[in-house]
Amino acid sequence: MKLLCADCRKEAAMGTLGRCGACDGILRPEYPDEVVAVLATVAPGPGIDRYRPLFPVTAPLPFLGEGDTPLLPSARLGRTLGLERLLFKNEGLNPSGAFKDRAGATMVALALDAGAKGLVTVSSGNTATAAATYCAAAGLRCLILLEPGNPPAKLRQALAMGAKVLPVEGVYAHGPDGTRDIIFGVAEGLGYYPAFVWAPVNPYILEGIKSVSYEIAARLPGAPDVLVCPVGGGDMLTAQWRGYLELQRAGVIDRLPRMVGVQSVAAPPLLEAFRNGDARVTPLPYARSRISGINVPFTGEHALAAVRASGGVVAGIADEDAFEIQRRLGAEEGIWVEPASAAPVAALPGLLAEGHIGSHETVVCLLSGAGFKDALLAADMADAVSARPPLPFDVEAVVSAALA
């Protein structure tokens, strides 16, 4: 295994954090062919530790039931939208309720390898709950620096797992360099591992997220025509592209999917870079989306490179469209997701209309987290029901109300 710059290909020492010292590119682990070949023979089983040869860790990954989430064919929405083969990878069924559990298991293994007493991370919510969950399982301390104003369910979840949570004003507002500096400084001061889940700062954690692509390839089998991902910092999308490249090297798949990233138009750093033809993603001075999981003002150029290399696109959606699809996924598919999970599905009508996907293609939407993570829509609906006067104890009254 080597740690190479994605741009200049200069090698860095394993364990290096941050960007390439020669050209400021993003570092990434790369594996020899004989290691990648295990993807053709890996035995089915629980958890993602069976893929450990393709992760930059030696310590076993703690297992709480993460991975092997279902790949579900759409029951109704696909037909309504005009797609014959729409599937949902439901990552909300991971132990803490989001795909970040794959990162949580990986960051804990990295902390154990480093001999750290604990780990520190910055989070908009799902990383916090995953880090807290897997630190608890491994007996490590967990410190979360949380952006104020995030959904209370995510805060409660992290606290319930024993994490120390410190709201820090403007933890993202100082840009990626500022976020990196506070993480590294706090980690050094406490003897903790700096577990910022963003490849330009920590190039190792996203490797565990690649396991989503391995599982999709095993279930289909092969690769979908299109994989649609919500995008905040860009690690989820990048990890899937890396996974599919490895699957192709191993001979497991014979073609690669087109990667589609989806952002809110109220927090669109990747969307703007893609539309402008930029080589880098310029951090924005704001992120005003109400979709908590993707309300991030900066995205790494690794996601931009993955979209372009795959022949994919970046789509923008209105927050309201994600909330409507969140409701419809529950009512029409029986899948309760947070708004960030609904973003890929909300982008499908526009992608179809613009010819970026075809009605006959196999399209997989990655549903990143469960509905309880950000349940404002459900809370509003419940409040509306609670505000109604109760019906009389009468059959006709109940039937009449049910039919109304």
What are these language model-derived features?
Residues 1-404:
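PLP-dependent amino-acid enzyme catalytic core
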